Amino acid sequence: DKINYLDREEIWAADETQVYYLDTAMEYSPPMACGRDMADRILEMEREGWDALCIRADTPEDGDSILQNNAHLARLPVVFLSDHPAALEAALRAYHGRAIVDSRSALDPRELGRIAARYGAVVL
């Protein structure tokens, strides 16, 4: 697997409708917990002017919450933060697009890179 670590020449993320070219100085929103209804929080983070939405995935079920109820609302790149391999994989699998994986995770960097590479995500 090719690990997609920061490539300063061409860093991008995408969702179903947009491609986002990323800047190394971008600021993530404070991590928000996954839940069935994140609409108000997502809209609040966008109004506050964050460059990307940081979503904390703590359980594999969080991936279902992202896909079923909230993914269509985000108009910013999505960053997943997780300290649990199964939760991170579920979130990346559920997300329709190329996500960012937050390198501040407590996971071993090699494991984080392998999981991100499996789903085409970029680690920043």
Where are these regions (language model features)?
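Domain-level signal for soluble alpha/beta catalytic cores
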Residues: 1-124
